[in-house]
A protein has these predicted regions:
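Anion-binding and metal-coordination hotspots
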Residues: 58-71, 82-472
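Composition-driven recognition of low-complexity segments enriched
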Residues: 41-44, 52-64, 74, 79-81
Length: 472
């Protein structure tokens, strides 16, 4: 067996790494029971090593792994040429979430002890990974209701046929048909229940447009990098800066990233036991809520704020206001009590209002000034006038953040975000072709993502070790 692979083969290193970790939690279920026939319980180190090694090969199918164990040298060496069936492999992968999370954190601890990670500075990014959803499984309320009714009819018919069977006839085929019918009904019922929940959360005008996949109810229709749309999950990845190791990974059904930053930071801290000092993310995470929450944690957020010009462009177009008269073109005067428009007219502070938890000062021009102005149509737009402009009253945390993002050294630091934060996506989706989950459901998708993260970290560690010169 030793001649199957070289001494520096990745399978050997993965076996050694898994041997350094406490995997007892994986084997908690392997207990003998009096009066019951024993079944083989494969060692956790073996199954963990097989899955990590397989993901580094870009193989995510339990059936494919079971076939490859007959000829792939690394898998043959790990299993000592023993055959492990696909059901055992598949059940192990998704059946030990808590143990897997503990193992992931243990390995990060070993990397920290080796001095190859910088847990003070984190980088965060998200990517969409397609779900295991059938092409024709995306249905609305009426179709799913019909599927449930039809499923119940089929089961009643099969039960009646089973009751009428003569004694001595082989009923295995009929039993399999009944089992398949019940599973189909359960999927339709789960999808219908999910759809009703989503309808309750949607705006009344959008409820009739809600759709759910019958084969993958948790998945959501999300925009893909190529501009298309597909039923997917949103994978949130947190990476440390020094060696690009993943320190946290999570899977959500939210198409928008804005609310995922703080849960990701908390997960990374739980995995490492170290409170980060800085987090770098793209502008999709730059919200006032995230600025305030990171400030409360003494966590420095580096994420480019969308300028007033970019935020207001759509609003100006909808309201018939020329870009030259957008709110950002009005200049403050007298300590923020007045604004001056591009045409030289004064706007006076008239009130303070709150939108989505943010205080805004409202400035308004004199009606006579707007009525006499030759730029009235371009400035006042569809509203007609007098012109009003709102300005956010920024909190101390927001002011500090905006000032920070103007510093040259911070801008230079942000330029490194892409090559670090997006590298795990390139490894998983580009190199290893992991562009679709191989398991169903949000929980199991999260478990598979953690296996991918573990395999990625191990592959990074193998790369780092290979670059270390061997002492003579």
């Amino acid at each position: 067996m030793e001649s199957l692979i070289d001494l520096d083969h990745p399978a050997r290193t993965i076996w050694e790494i898994s041997g350094e970790l406490d995997l007892s939690r994986f084997e908690a279920h392997c207990k003998a029971r009096e009066g019951e026939a024993g079944r083989p319980c494969w060692p956790a180190q073996l199954l963990v090593s097989i899955w990590i090694y397989s993901y580094t090969l870009g193989v995510a199918s339990a059936r494919a792994i079971a076939r490859m164990m007959k000829h792939e040298p690394g898998l043959r060496w790990l299993s000592a040429d023993q055959e492990i069936n696909a059901h055992t492999l598949g059940d192990f992968r998704v059946g030990h979430q808590a143990a897997l999370e503990e193992m992931f954190a243990q390995f990060l601890g070993l990397l920290d002890e080796a001095g190859v990670v910088d847990l003070r500075r984190l980088l965060h990014d998200g990517t969409k990974v397609k779900a295991v959803a059938g092409r024709g499984s995306y249905h609305g309320l009426r179709t799913l209701q019909d599927r449930v009714r039809q499923g119940r009819k089929v089961i009643r018919k099969l039960d009646q046929e089973a009751a009428a069977q003569h004694e001595g006839m082989d009923g295995k085929h009929e039993a399999a048909k009944r089992r398949a019918a019940r599973e189909a009904l359960q999927r339709a019922q789960a999808a219908l229940e999910k759809l009703k929940k989503l309808q309750a959360e949607a705006a009344p005008s959008q409820q009739q447009n809600v759709r759910v996949s019958e084969s993958e109810p948790d998945a959501r229709r999300m925009k893909q990098p190529d501009g298309g749309w597909a039923l997917s999950y949103n994978v949130q990845v947190t990476t440390e800066a020094q060696s690009r190791m993943i320190v946290g990974i999570g899977v959500t059904d939210a198409g928008n990233d804005t609310q995922e930053l703080m849960p990701a930071v908390e997960k990374a801290q739980a995995n490492t036991g170290v409170a980060p000092e800085q987090v770098i993310a793209d502008n999709g995470y730059a919200t006032r809520a995230n600025v305030e929450q990171t400030s409360e944690r003494n966590l420095e957020l580096i994420a480019p704020w969308k300028t007033d010009e970019s935020r207001e462009a759509g609003a100006c177009q909808r309201n018939g206001i020329a870009a030259a008269f957008g709110p950002s073109q009005f200049r403050g005067q007298r300590g923020g009590q007045k604004l001056q428009c591009p045409a030289g007219k004064k706007l006076i502070l008239i009130q303070q209002i709150t939108h989505h938890g943010v205080r805004n000062n409202v400035f308004e021009a004199r009606p006579a000034d707007c009525n006499r102005c030759r730029w009235r149509k371009a400035c006042c737009g569809k509203r007609g006038g007098p012109r009003r402009v709102e300005r956010a009253v920024e909190s101390p945390a927001m002011k500090q953040y905006l000032e920070r993002m103007q510093r040259p050294e911070v801008k230079q630091l942000y330029r490194k975000r892409c090559e670090i934060a997006e590298f795990p996506h390139l490894w998983a989706k580009g190199v290893k072709k992991w562009r679709r989950f191989s398991v169903r459901g949000l929980v199991k998708a999260g478990i598979e993502a953690l296996w991918v993260a573990m395999a990625y970290n191990v592959s990074q560690w193998l790369r780092i070790k290979s670059a270390i010169p061997v002492a003579a």
